Amino acid sequence: MKTRRAAIAASLALTSLLAAACGSGGDAGSGDGGPVTLTFQSLSDQPAAIAATNKIVGAWNQAHPDTQVKVVQAGWDSAYDKLITQFNAGTAPDIVHYEAAGIGPFAADGYLADLSSYLSEQKRADIPKGVLDSVTVDSKVVAYPTELQSYVVFANKKLLEQSGAQVPTGETMTWDQLRQLAKTATKDGKYGLGWGLSSPTATFVAMAPAFGGKYFEGTGDQAQISVGQGEMALPQLVHDMNATDHSILPVTLTQSGGKALAPFYAGQVAMTVQGSYQAANIEKDAPKDLDWVALPPIAGPAGPAQAANPQTLSVNKDSKHVEQAAKFLDFFTNTENLAALNEADTLIPASNSARDALDKKLGAKKGWSTILASGKYLTSAPYLFAGKYAQWKDTVATPAYQRFLANQIDANTLAQQLKDGWKSVGK
């Protein structure tokens, strides 16, 4: 973070553009006892989510004439670099929309307000512990969590049944069950599973808690990597399903999750692992005769846990109106609003009450009940607080995992490359 600042200081042209876009952190209209105006930089990029956000903000503005919120529509592309520039230039918005995996460095550098005292006991109890942990840095709550995703197995029910496999039901299923299902369904030129793993690191790290995997110990630049049985279990399983069982359509391992939906739609694979939000795309884009289901959350030896990386709302510590901004966050994340936002984005609400409300409304719709239930198992993970994680993910882990899945290196070499790469990152 510190080394980035020297480079950022030279970016005066970009800084001036951002200053024009975001103003000076809530000054507008606040002089002489007039109404306070808070800037809210929203990264929502789906039309339905943008509309839901604007509706929530509109309701707040109508009810709070003395504290008005102005939405500044941004986007996820280069969001991290934009925020670095804004914070260093003093032009960051009052309210910052981002994600748990990215806010740690900003909190560590003192850019985010401590919201602990504004978070009511009722709301604190409504947020699952693992999710709240993901937005807690040095014992300070630095964001309100809003939306989550999990990884879900979507299945072509007809293909599974035709293969002689029994479609799993119940609260959870096991990875051994998934492997056997894929083997059983691999026949007659069709594969049991398609899994878009062109960028496998985020998936493997997020799903490691089910195997007891942590990957990292410590925080910030002091975080140390750990690559043992719990971390290697899922990559090894995927490798074996591909190289030994031949139950994964090989090309999907080189594709994104979205691209891997095409063979699922075409009936080439019986199952596909996807981000839970893809349920909306499957419902919209799949052939009408595709009878698809969302299978129960997958449990490993340590249960069905997955790492939570919620979208977040934080308050700029330098805002002149931290208290008013925190009150807006409390309103934005109430049960009704969170349920509406997550329905629009096809995501999982970060509070129990909003998740229950959405399940009550949409639980009968295909896939929703299972997806929402998976939210119960989302937990915190150390990678969220490892300072060099993003660089390690892109420059070390992803190419190493790709080589391993392509059978170019063995498991021991993979583990060594992951560990050695962590030590070399940032040097």
Functional labels for PLM-detected ranges:
Residues P93-D94, K123-L159, L181, G192, ...:
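A structural signal for short loop-to-beta-strand junctions that line the ligand-binding cleft
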Residues D138, V142-T146, Y151, D176-Q224, ...:
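Extracytoplasmic/periplasmic solute-binding protein
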Residues A182-T184, Q222-T252:
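Glycine-centered hinge/linker elements that transmit conformational signals in sensory
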Residues Q62, S163, D240-H246, K284-L347, ...:
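Extracytoplasmic/periplasmic substrate-recognition and gating elements
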Residues S369-W422:
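C-terminal capping/gating helix-and-loop segments adjacent to ligand/active sites or protein-protein/ligand interfaces
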Residues Y277-A280, Q311-Q391:
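Mature extracytoplasmic/periplasmic domains
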Residues K2-P105, R124, V167, P301-A302, ...:
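Conserved N-terminal structural module of periplasmic/extracytoplasmic solute-binding proteins
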Residues A100-Y151, Q177, M207, D291-L295, ...:
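Hinge/lid segment of periplasmic solute-binding proteins
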